[in-house]
Curated annotation (Swiss-Prot):
The lineage of its organism: Bacteria, Pseudomonadati, Pseudomonadota, Alphaproteobacteria, Rickettsiales. Belongs to the prokaryotic/mitochondrial release factor family. Its main location: cytoplasm. It comes from Wolbachia sp. subsp. Brugia malayi (strain TRS). The keyword Cytoplasm applies. The gene is prfA. This is Peptide chain release factor 1. It comes from the Bacteria. It is found in: Cytoplasm. The modification N5-methylglutamine is found at Q236. Methylated by PrmC. Methylation increases the termination efficiency of RF1. PROSITE patterns: RF_PROK_I.
């Protein structure tokens, strides 16, 4: 089908939705929510289409001036300059923006996200690094006015985290954080190291889209739920009631333990939320592999075994190995969560890969 017809169809659809939303009393709550979502998704695309249409009209008008034998010489020359800039420079730029805007969206991009961090190789130093990463993402969430809600933290007693998870709520959380999944490596001299020897440790980060029960249902028969008394560092009991919950998904043998809340009901709800996100992510990855068999994405795999970034403290340097980007602002990134330098490039690179795959 002609691309021009597609663009005009989109404009007509947008205008139709706009008219509908002008009289919300005629809509059910579900219709209003769905139309509002579609309207907000279409609005940036329509803005580019309007820009494209305006530019094409301006180019045609300039063509008329250039062809008109009655046009004065100076006006013709100015028109030729403007025509060249708009035809050869601006139009290709707007076309590229339009092509990108029309690419199929990742349906999970608008979702909230569950952050999971696990200490890897490196013992206590790895646990301290995991805690540092957890705080870094918390700072980044604050910078973007997202809500950062810790779900579960398994600490080592001296400030490190063996495991930690959090729910992050806000606008396009998953879209911006999904490329953070993978192995993060740190190189630094531990405070306890008397010889000053450089240690290398690692932590694994997983970013999972949050899914509601209506979006992804888990069969009750596939679950085993055990309750017990919660324990603190070293195994000592910190609760006199059976509030800790262990949920096992029998088909996959996946286990989620939640004991941070005093209420068994709240712990169960949180554990099920994490389990649902993990199972959904497995299905999502299967679909992504099917979609990308024809093209090998360098940054979009989200493979948790892939080493994606190294934090070198002696040189105050952070390197993202997927995009060969190095920053010497380690302090600001770690302590203030200034991650956008990396995230923006990762998003742009992914968009370029998707465009190449469509062409």
């Amino acid at each position: 089908m002609d691309i021009e017809n597609n663009l005009q169809d989109l404009k007509r659809k947008f205008n139709y939705i706009e008219r509908k939303l002008e009289n919300p009393t005629n809509l059910s709550q579900k219709e209003f929510i769905n139309l509002s979502k579609e309207y907000s998704e279409l609005r940036p695309i329509i803005k580019i289409i309007n820009e494209y249409d305006t530019l094409k009209k301006e180019i045609l008008d300039l063509e008329e001036i250039i062809k008109d034998e009655n046009s004065e010489y100076d006006i013709k020359e100015l028109a030729k300059e403007e025509f060249f800039e708009k035809q050869k420079v601006l139009l290709p730029q707007v076309k590229a923006k339009l092509k990108l805007a029309l690419l199929p969206k990742d349906e999970d991009d608008s979702r909230n996200a569950i952050l999971e961090i696990r200490a890897g190789t490196g013992g206590e130093e790895a646990a301290l690094f995991a805690a540092m990463l957890f705080r870094m993402y918390q700072k980044y969430a604050e910078r973007r006015n997202w809500k950062f809600e810790p779900i579960s933290i398994s600490s080592t007693g001296i400030g490190g985290y063996k495991e930690a998870s959090a729910l992050i709520n806000g606008t396009e959380v998953f879209a911006r954080l999904k490329f953070e999944s993978g192995v993060h490596r740190v190189q630094r001299v531990p405070e306890t190291e008397s010889s000053g020897r450089l240690h290398t440790s690692a932590a694994t980060v997983a970013i999972l889209p949050e899914v509601e029960e209506v979006d992804f249902k888990i069969e009750e028969k596939d679950l085993r739920i055990d309750v017990y008394r919660s324990s603190g560092p070293g195994g000592q009991s910190v609760n006199t009631t059976d509030s800790a919950v262990r949920v096992t998904h029998l088909p996959t043998e996946m286990v989620v333990i939640q004991q941070d809340e005093k209420s068994q009901h709240k712990n169960k709800a949180k554990a099920l939320k994490v389990l649902r996100a993990r199972l959904y992510e497995i299905e999502r990855q299967k679909k992504e592999i099917e979609r990308s068999t024809m093209r090998k994405s360098q940054i979009g795999s989200g493979d948790r075994s892939e080493r994606i970034r190294t934090y070198n403290f002696p040189q105050s340097r952070i390197t993202d190995h997927r995009i060969n980007l190095t920053s010497h602002q380690l302090e600001q990134i770690i302590k203030e969560g200034e991650l956008d330098e990396f995230i923006e490039v990762l998003i742009s690179r992914n968009e370029a890969e998707r465009l190449a795959g469509e062409s």
